[in-house]
């Protein structure tokens, strides 16, 4: 049986339940196996007005039973159930008579406990898939026999445990199992994320029909809880809140103002030099209209030249540290974020000093959201979540302040759409509540900095696979070992569609010599971008299909872009040296301004959740024989549609955004000096994150 390879229980097993001080009658316990989507499960359950609490996977069964939980949900996680370091759990949770829903890793765990087997498949599934369902199963009642879901896994159920039946399949892969008499259900996909179209129906079936929950957990309760927590923690002390002007920090400040006296709240807007065009001025004006007095600090010089302390190397587990390069000479995305986060804190401390306040009597408030903490693998969000990227508001220094109890984060249990609802409850104006998010590090994380191209040993082989994919209809006539790999990673339906697309369109697909951050299978991926160009007018539906298919076949690719303009004859294999210098930032600032101005004027800004505009160090259209150096850069437009920012899809031109609007953006951005090409990000999340860094 799976007691983390069967042996001993860890000393801290049981979380906060074992003291018996709480009672959760009617609530659902989510046992956290380390999933990036763990808190999304929590949010989806609460959206259905059912109270949920998250505890470690190793929480003992007796504690769950004694505390009155009505049902159990086991999250996904990055481990294999057979790994030596697989997390410990109490198998008795399956024998206490509580309905259980196992998601991804949770399903594999359930299957293994009851005698089934799990093994690593040759093909990962990362992305959106059509799966078949048995809609006579209580879990899938009211659904179609085929549904669109998000799958992100490498291990799969092989032999189904006795007493369970298969209730969903993705091709020949088991996607759902059930033992209805014991109310035990497992799904390989993620019903909690927006990319699973009817995931909420599945969760509702489990919570209401199977577990018998009642819906009496409301947003108003959570607002009151936030205010109570602020009052209790701050008392008569002062709070310094860093305001970006976005919805998160504004709602955070509104909560502080409601909970505390006005003279206790010190609102500061720091212009870090990475703001959008005229951003700081508009932030100050908007907040003054709300009656919030803001101290604006121009700290661009401090950020450009900022440094921080870092481990000697990623492998070095000793406490030894090194001083980083200055930010304007740094190319590592992780180091950039850490420098920016720590510089924010240093400047906040300077403000405290200038105002003659005692540091020990001042709290730092942030509008940190749940996705920030999950992607940073913060213990506040999840004790096991794998690091995807460091967020500027969750650096080591911030964590140290948090450990000291000096950080106030009233929105730490909220996701973006919930913050908007809360903002409306607090009577904030709609233009602020519905504003597109803008990251605290600003344009700094929208410049792909590089000194040299990113080309590893797998670069040539991956390019050969992409050539086969882009010309699949011709490639199938010429036997090749890599062709067999492509076929092994795709279904017959995929191959038929690929044949159709490549017969109709002349495509060129290749790797770009840069890397961006992504997420695959609950873990961080940091890898290549695939570019697609064509002499034909773009068929956007086909391009979106290719963007889903390519990362499934090539796990070293986490992003796919379409390159506007004529076919790329000679893909770049070098880069334009790019750092966070004023000239580089000025170029991106203008591109961002043009794109967002066109989106606003089109009236479609409300249809798009966020639209990062990214500057890459890529110079196309150079004759290699002339050995022209790389000196221009290219821009990426990243439209993104999501409900929670944990998963999402690009806006498809012609559907969610008019083609003419996108083409107008391309035309205006191309006029900016030093711009080589414009690209359109076709990638969903996963495998690509919202931002490129």
Swiss-Prot record:
GO biological process, one term: GMP biosynthetic process
Domain GMPS ATP-PPase: 217-435
Pfam families: GATase, GMP_synt_C, NAD_synthase
Residues where XMP binds: 337, 522, 610, 685, 691
Binding site for ATP: 244-250
N6-acetyllysine found at: 9
Needed cofactors: Mg(2+)
Record bears the keyword Lipoprotein: no
Activity versus pH, per record: Optimum pH is 7.6.
Its EC number(s): 6.3.5.2
Main location: cytoplasm
In-chain residues carrying the UniProt-annotated modification Phosphoserine: 8, 332
Residue positions, PTM Phosphothreonine: 318
Subcellular location: Cytoplasm, Cytosol
Keywords: Acetylation, ATP-binding, Cytoplasm, Glutamine amidotransferase, GMP biosynthesis, Ligase, Nucleotide-binding, Phosphoprotein, Purine biosynthesis
SUPFAM superfamilies: Adenine nucleotide alpha hydrolases-like, Class I glutamine amidotransferase-like, GMP synthetase C-terminal dimerisation domain
Gene Ontology molecular function: ATP binding; GMP synthase (glutamine-hydrolyzing) activity; GMP synthase activity
Activation and inhibition: Stimulated by dithiothreitol and inhibited by 2-mercaptoethanol, p-chloromercuribenzoate and hydroxylamine.
Residue positions, PTM N-acetylalanine: 2
Keyword Phosphoprotein: yes
A Gene Ontology term for the protein's cellular component: cytosol
Binding partners and assembly: Homodimer.
Job description of the protein: Catalyzes the conversion of xanthine monophosphate (XMP) to GMP in the presence of glutamine and ATP through an adenyl-XMP intermediate.
Protein name, per record: GMP synthase [glutamine-hydrolyzing]
Organism name: Mus musculus
Lineage: Eukaryota, Metazoa, Chordata, Craniata, Vertebrata
